[in-house]
Design a protein with these regions (language model features):
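Histidine-acidic metal/acid-base catalytic patches
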Residues: 1-4, 72-76, 91-95, 99-103, ...
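Active-site acidic/histidine proton-transfer and metal-coordination neighborhood
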Residues: 1-145
Length: 227
């Protein structure tokens, strides 16, 4: 009983980012979509208002109103923070909490940055196999692990998801299975979970998780809104 795993992220100022929360597909379903060219046209100070407006009255996780009310101040705070400094802060945080995690058997499962590249100049540090491996080596306690989100890491087609699964085997505590479809450089839609509907080989990903000894929790992630 109780909490034995925490999925969290270390993305400063705001969480995941999309340019469209309800892109209409030919079959009438809607999906979350990202287009860097559209993001580049948005004033960072107003992105919270635009995201919440698109949410049609719902409060989006990672875009909570109390946090977004301070977005200008947060941007100012992180304006001079480098990726190296953010990484050092993450390592410091994890080292400080590991004794408590050991006492209560809590696995920490960091979620990759979404998308897997810097947005509005903010540092992003959990976005590739190299960066994930770097963190796991810096804090080698097996309770320090990751949430393997195929859609977040897979947003960058240069990320080899199968390779990453084997590179960090034993440290994947949570898996988010999400398919995406590429439409060009830093441009993608979220897709249904069938491999044929997107750009990710979901069957191969699940097989790699099984073959690498994964015994954590899997959650089907996002997909389409069909009603």
């Amino acid at each position: 009983a109780g909490i034995d795993m925490i999925c969290y992220n270390f993305m400063p100022v705001f969480d995941w980012t999309r340019s469209d929360l309800a892109k209409v597909l030919p079959d009438g379903s809607t999906v979350l979509s990202y287009d860097q060219a559209l993001i580049d046209k948005i004033n960072p100070d107003s992105i919270a208002d635009q995201m919440n407006k698109k949410a049609q009255g719902s409060e989006l996780p990672g875009w909570e109103s109390e946090r977004m009310a301070q977005i200008k101040e947060l941007f100012a705070i992180y304006e001079t923070v480098t990726e190296e400094q953010l990484f050092d802060n993450l390592v410091y945080f994890l080292n400080k909490i590991m004794p408590t995690c050991e006492k209560y058997g809590i696995r920490m499962a960091i979620h990759p940055d979404d998308p897997a590249w810097p947005v509005f100049g903010l540092p992003r540090i959990i976005n590739s196999e190299a960066n994930i491996t770097k963190l796991l080596e810096a804090v080698p306690n097996p309770l320090n692990g990751i949430t393997f989100c195929t859609g977040s890491l897979g947003s960058n087609p240069e990320n080899d998801l199968i390779s990453t699964i084997y590179a960090v085997k034993g440290r994947i505590h949570f898996a988010h299975l999400r398919n995406i479809k590429y439409h060009g450089y830093q441009k993608f839609d979220e897709a249904s979970h069938l491999s044929s509907d997107g750009s990710l080989d979901m069957v191969a990903i699940i097989k790699a998780l099984r073959d690498s000894g994964f015994d954590g929790i899997i959650r089907p992630d996002h997909g389409r809104q069909i009603w």
